[in-house]
Structures are given as structure tokens and as C-alpha cells.
């Protein structure tokens, strides 16, 4: 039905058009004007007319203007009728202004000009436990496994990787209530147990995949195959980097650490601009990046860079700002600046003796010392404004665990998990303590996760197979509610049964803490809008402050 009551808010009124960054199918960013706010009161259908007025569909339709002449209204009647609408407009405008002002401006080069809301965190550190940590031996104790050790599984067993399935297997590790929260933590992690009050342990994580490479891709990108951007690339793309001399996304390795199954594609920018890919730094080598130390004076290199830029800039314009060309230019300009920054970053001689001891750098355990150096450099990268940092476990070939998947104990679980925990326990706890003591934990979100968990029944005599149906991850810092448990698996630790959580939910929560609405950070490629959480994901608000 036609309604004569409509208040239009146009581009020239209090609500003006704001440029919004969108993507063409070829990946080139363009600015398009859209109304910043849609505020109106109407008793009839509303249409948006480009960047102009938002109007009632009939009141400005000349073909039906004769209908307006059939009814007349006094000014008093009109104001009385529309008073509620005017109030709604004013209130909505006030609320919108407050929400808009709560966002934070982002550095040049970020796809978003501002965060979507006030961020709780500025940086993310991803401690990836490649191979699959057993949740029932680490953060999700199951007394029933101990009581029924050696008995057949009382429920149907899903197909596993090798189908060499045994009976129920009790944990060889003891659990102790820890911290003020009293959360039980395995004897594998005595140091992490001391900081458990900083952790939000999610016991109901799930994955649809039980093979390493696919599960690794899914955990990193939200898709089971290569070719998609990793979480770190999305963070760097959307938020940019606070330090133009360093990449926005850094992957640290040390000792025998290599990329997990899936290779360096796990750190890929996918179809995002190339400068958002993960840059690998060797944390314990003289040169964190090969040939980072220049052979020529800096002034000479500057002249060369300026000379090359004379050709690059016109070519970039000829290609209509092709994303790959632009990324290549940005990459070698960043590499030039990194020549002086990276050696200083990796020089930890200025760190105190107490700091070295805290991270285990002076330990006789060379693997702990190597992983500890990654954790220390992660803190130093946070101090220098790097947006996303991923840490890599060192090789441990025990019970089928190998270079890409050292936590993969299909046999010798007690020995293999014990050795891997020895490597990472003290350094990760030290990272949390150090960040907190420096006032950095509040704006640094730490994510600890593997690609899946492990079965409550044995594989062979003393190992466990892959279990994607329910496992544990944890978050710390960055506005997370510490000292809590979220969700649960059944009493066997086989399936998530309470507050079932997905990888999409985890990354939606991380982006939320970084000030980003995961549904609104998109990139158009191949005819559709992609995002880290695909078409899924819910923010886990219960684990947030």
C-alpha cells in the first residue's frame, strides 16, 4: 500500500557517502561510494538511489504524484505523525557515531581503512603443534579411560588412518588441578600449568578431516586444499602492518623445524596480494634470511632501487595496478628495508640473563633452547608491530612422528609426547609470562592448536590414531577470559558433545579480537567473495572478556 510518510536521508544531508573498499574479479581494489548510514522512517517500501537519497518508493514517483493531491496534511499533523521517526533518526545517528568512533584507523596498505569495532588485540601468535596432540593426555582428562584400560571400545569406532585399532588406552600421564581456577593439566606441561589461569581451554574443537596435509590446510586456511590464503595472510591483508620495515606475517623456524605436511603453501597468500604471504625467518641462524646482509653500501642500493623504480612504476600503471606486479614491487622494497632491521631483531645479546633462563635458551636441551628462541623472537616481533607470527615445532622422530608432524605418535606415545612437550612447555609458558610482565599480553592473542586430536583407544600397543571428532585447543591474552574451560567431549574423549566448535569459529573469534568482523573481511576472486571463515563461523563470545 502507498504511504505518504517517508523521510529520505541523502548524500548531502547529515549522513554522507563514505568510500568503501571492494574488489573486482581480477583482485584489483577500487573505491566505491555507498551510504555510510541508512537511517529512515517510513510506512512504505524504501529504495536506495545510488549515493543519493533513500526514499519512499512512491512519494517521489512523478507518475503517481496525482495521488498526493487527494490527501492534504497540515504541518502540525505531519510533525505529530513523524515525531517518532525523527527521534529514531537522531538516536540511530548518535549510536552510529559512537560505534564508528570506537573503530581504530589502520596503517596505509591495509585493505580496511578502519577496524570494524574497537580491537582487543593487535597481534596474534599461533603456536602450531604439528602432528596432532592427544587431548586426553594434555588438557582433557578422562578417568573412564584409566578405569577401563584394555577393554574394548563400547561405541562404534570411526574409520581411522590405519585401522590398526586396539582397546581403550588410559593416559600414561597424571593430571593435577592447577592455578586458582583448578583446571587439570597433564604432567606433560608443568610450566604451562603455572599459567593456566591465563588460558581459555576449548575442549570441543572439531575438524572434518583426519589426514595431516588436508587437516593442516583446513586449520590454516579454512579449506582442505592448497591455493587459499592462510589466517596470517588474511590478518596482514585486512589490518596491514604497524612496521613497514617488516612483513605483516612472519613464520619462525629453528633447529630441525620444517613446514608441516602441506609445505610452505600453508603460509600462502593464496589469491590475496603477494606481500601478505608468510615470510620464514630462521630464528637460530646467523642469517635469519639467506643473504640478508648486503654486500654493497646502503647508498648504492638506494640508487639501484630508485633506478629500478623508474621502470616499475610506469609498468604498474600499464597493467592497471595489477596485484601481482604491485606485490612484487612491495616485496623487494620491504626486503631492502629488512636488511638493517632483521639482524637487529635476531640479536638477542641485549636480553637479560634472566630472560635467557626464562625461555630455556641456556638449557642443555638443544631443542628446547631452539624453540625458546622462536618464542623470544615472537615477543620481539610483537614489540616491533608485526601482525601475525607462527611458531614451528622441531623434528622428533618417535612413534611415526617425523619432520613435518613431530606430535604424530601412532606408537610410543608416552616417549614421543613427553619429548615434544619438553621442547615447547617452558618456552610457551615463558612467552605468556614475559608478555604479561611487559604489558603486552593484553593486546597479543596466543593460539595453541594442532590439526586434530588423538583417539581414546590405542593403535598398536602404545600409540593413538588421529581423532578429528573432538579435541582441545586454547587461547590466551588478547581479551580472552583466562582460567576457563569451554565445551566438552564425551566421557571417552571421542566426540565433542557440548558447545561443539569448528575451526571457522576459532578464526572468527581471533578476527573479532583484532577488531574485524569475519563476515566483512572478503576478497573477490573467481566470481565470488572469499573469506577466511568461508560461509561459516561464530564468535565464541563466552571465552571473551
Feature map (PLM): residue ranges:
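Intrinsically disordered, low-complexity regions enriched for glutamine and histidine
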Residues: 16, 22, 30-36, 45, ...
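Short, low-complexity intrinsically disordered segments enriched in A/P/G/S/L with frequent Arg
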Residues: 3, 11, 18-19, 29-33, ...
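N-terminal secretory signal peptides
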Residues: 34, 38-74
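Intrinsic-disorder/low-complexity regions
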Residues: 11, 15, 25, 30, ...
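Ligand-binding pockets and gating/stacking loops
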Residues: 60-545
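Composition-driven detection of intrinsically disordered, low-complexity segments
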Residues: 21-23, 28-31, 36-37, 43, ...
